[in-house]
Design a protein with these regions (language model features):
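Chalcogenol-based redox active-site neighborhoods
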Residues: 5-165
Length: 166
């Protein structure tokens, strides 16, 4: 397992199951917080697809949220499609209820679709077990990168390496 696939969640180290580089992007078809349905193949015209497992309640996502939004603004005009997916059970995490996801996306002006994985089937297909969990797929929708956004989740002023830089 690469270090990029390891995350501290609470006080426990949680590892996402690495998809091997070159693995095809798992298929998905999910409803977004705005009521539209999006599918993996609906982004075919984009040369890259960035799938981000995120949510509202996670302090690690909250810490990098503005950087995720900046990535969407930076890469969107370059025809890179970013997609956020929340796979949490809202019964366990009330902040991740659809209406709260929608409110957060509007409040923060997410520049990407924010999808709801109600069954967690998509998260399982990706092997995503924590947030944020970032997957970058190339034009052929083969995995090119899996890991973090940068090297300091807590303090953007202390970032020395941006893994998702052009």
């Amino acid at each position: 397992m690469s270090a990029a696939g390891r995350y501290l969640v609470g006080m426990a180290l949680t590892e996402s199951k690495d998809l091997a580089l070159g693995t095809p992007c798992p298929d998905f078809r999910l409803r977004s917080v705005d009521g539209k349905t999006y599918a993996r193949d609906g982004f075919r015209e984009k040369p890259a697809l960035v799938v981000m497992f995120i949510c509202n309640h996670c302090p690690y996502v909250q810490a990098v949220e503005d950087r995720i939004i900046a990535l969407a603004r930076e890469y969107g005009p370059r025809s890179v499609q970013l997609v956020g997916i929340c796979s949490n059970d809202p019964t366990d995490y009330p902040d991740d209820r659809p209406e709260r996801l929608r409110a957060r996306a509007r409040e923060k002006r997410y520049g990407f679709p924010y999808l709801i994985d109600e069954t967690q089937d998509v998260a399982r297909a990706f092997g995503a077990v924590c947030t944020p969990d970032i997957y970058v797929f190339d034009r052929d929708r083969r995995l090119a990168y899996h890991g973090r956004i940068d090297d300091n989740w807590n303090d953007p002023k202390k970032v020395t390496r941006r893994e998702l830089a052009a």
